[in-house]
Amino acid sequence: MNNMPRLALKRAFMDIITDQLGLDLNAEHAKLSSDTDATVWIVEMDETFTPIRGSGNGQLSSLNIEFQVFSSRGETAVHKAVYDLIKIDATNPRLIETGIRIMDINPVASKTAWEDDSSDGYVVATLTLKIDYQARF
């Protein structure tokens, strides 16, 4: 691997969102509202590293990846999307394709807000997933 593993994980999650979950992805971060049931974007990644003793350049990595899910149509679709994201686990074939040794994926936090300051209003939920994996640099 010649780049940060988190980029491969981000791209795998993007594929899972569109190909497996069938959700719209706001990949360019350009949409401000959505006419679809739910649109997802990845808004932040935060990572920590712990050296593995005796393994040279091995690191135990803990990646928090934050998703936003929004819709102007309804809260049910937004919450279903959050639920589906939480259900993604380390045995997902697309994550295995990355070649990254993922040890665990767990939800860390989630919240929902109802915005009424736009003409249509919308619901937005956030979800943070923690991905523990082994990396080599």
Task: Write out the residue ranges for each language-model feature.
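Charged, amphipathic alpha-helical segments and their flanking helix caps
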Residues: 1-33, 46-137
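Low-complexity, acidic Ser/Thr/Pro/Gly-rich terminal tails and inter-domain linkers that flank the onset
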Residues: 38-46
